Amino acid sequence: MLYPTRFDVIVVGGGHAGTEAALAAARAGANTLLLTHNLDTLGAMSCNPSIGGIGKGHLVREVDALGGAMAAATDEAGIQFRILNASKGPAVRATRAQADRVLYKQAIRTRLENQPNLTIFAEACDDLIVEGDKVCGAVTQLGIRFMAEAVVLTAGTFLNGKIHVGLENYTGGRMGDPPSVSLASRLKELKLPQGRLKTGTPPRLDGKTIDFSVMEEQHSDDPLPVFSFLGNAAQHPKQLPCWITETNERTHDIIRSGLDRSPMYTGVIEGVGPRYCPSIEDKIHRFADKNQHNVFLEPEGLTTHEIYPNGVSTSLPFDIQLALVRSIRGMENCHILRPGYAIEYDFYDPRGLKDTLETKAIHGLFFAGQINGTTGYEEAAAQGLLAGINAVRYVRGQSGWCPKRNEAYLGVLVDDLITRGVSDPYRMFTSRAEYRLSLREDNADLRLTEQGRELGLVDDVRWTAFCQKRDAIAAEQERLKSTWVNPKITPADDCIRVLGKAIDHEYNLFELLRRPEVTYTSLLTLPGAGEAQTDPLVVEQLEISAKYQGYIDRQAEEVAKSSSYENTVLPSELDYSSVAGLSNEVRQKLAQHKPQTIGQASRIQGITPAAISLLLIHLKRHNLSQAA
């Protein structure tokens, strides 16, 4: 059957990538269809009940700055909020929240159901309609044909998913959900470059059978952080603690005794797992010198006793899982509600994507999330938003949009994926961003909201709040720079009280704020300093911009130097065999990767500075240079 309505954009999958993609496309005004196999799992947190963390929290704030849903949903569902790296510099501080799974899904579904231009249909997608090298629609299990100009595929771990518990395995997209086999077969026919990856999850525990009194208790920060730039702590539900315990030598002996039945260590699992989120059996093997590993017991929600034991992801046989759990302090009588498991799934080499996340091989087909080799809700959400807005721009015949590496962690994420590919599931860290001093959580809105408004992603409420904040920062910064403190007028006692010492010549307030020991609040107590700003977000930006100005200015100079590379386009039809002086290895890599700019080419492994110089000479000699 051909569905009577033709859509602009179809989004396949209702996870974190799919929901952000559908919301972004619809916000931008496109008639959008979201296909999901189950309405009840829209926005489901398939693994850990948390959002954010180092690098990941930065992505969440960027999604929020562009009008996305993840941060706001977390504010409504978060049952514990903490700032990680709070004692370190602002570039690496990150928000992390435990979320009530049910409340989070409700928050996402409410936004989906109330989003204009968005239609939801509950049917698994079994096929894509492709004519020549262009996608034209999608076909469901029942054979219903939905037509569209663009399709965003966010299949998560469902493509040929296989679940492993010990040496037992069965097909599944996640525990309790069927895999997507027909769609996986169809994608193989399209000759897209693919591979297999693996991820895992720990057993879920019954909190009624755990002795929390012998564990370290961990509470929310005070005052409570918020994730969304429009959020406030009053939105948060009741806050719950987490608990910390640890494995021991007995635990490790139990794990070692089960390795002969581990799918990872017997070669049953072929997919590569996440390097930075290893299973407990992998930790014991890789870090044999450690006699204990922390286990964080995280509540799954306000209305359940279910506990997520962060740190013991495993695919060991169930009898070993039960024994290892019961060997841990406070968990001697613990009941497992659900076993831990590993899941293998198909992914597609992201080097086959443009920076818009459109596939190079099939026009109008976009990939986002774990299908691109990433791991994590936050990475998926960021890709989903980007793919959603670019699908709309593709339909409208507009140029694609992707922030650069110096503009957003989203830009770092995409650039890493499409230039370097993945050998194991990709996770975001602040260390991946060379311009991280400028890419902070606190200024994500100042970096991206104006672009989001131009793209049609930012509504009037967010735009008004942003403009008020932006203008207040600019006005107060200008006032500080034009308000002077003169030692002949300001009493020395006041200078010593605020600055720690007297001053010997005139300074403006902004110059004084650059001093590490001086706070904005104390500075404004100087006679004649004027009325202080009361908005803490404005004050935060004033202090950071003053104290880190020198570093930020130097980073801006580095960006300016590299911008010529980033803005020089490599024609898609360029024949690298015609570029004089390139080695055969370099030619093969460039032909395989098809970088869009000189900047992307420079980050491909094995591409030397000399090769980049030869490319630039070739472009200039043949009048092929053009700006991005």
Curated annotation (Swiss-Prot):
GO BP of this protein: tRNA methylation; tRNA wobble uridine modification
Question: Which cofactors is this protein said to need?
Answer: FAD
The residues that the entry says bind FAD are: G13, G14, G15, H16, A17, G18
User: What species is this protein from?
Assistant: Dechloromonas aromatica (strain RCB)
Supply the source organism's classification: Bacteria, Pseudomonadati, Pseudomonadota, Betaproteobacteria, Rhodocyclales
Keyword NAD among record annotations: yes
Q: Which GO terms describe its cellular component?
A: cytosol
Q: Which molecular-function annotation in GO is an example for this chain?
A: flavin adenine dinucleotide binding
The entry assigns this protein to a family as follows:
Belongs to the MnmG family.
* Protein name (record): tRNA uridine 5-carboxymethylaminomethyl modification enzyme MnmG
**Stored HAMAP family:** MnmG_GidA
Which superkingdom does the taxonomy of this entry point to?
Answer: Bacteria
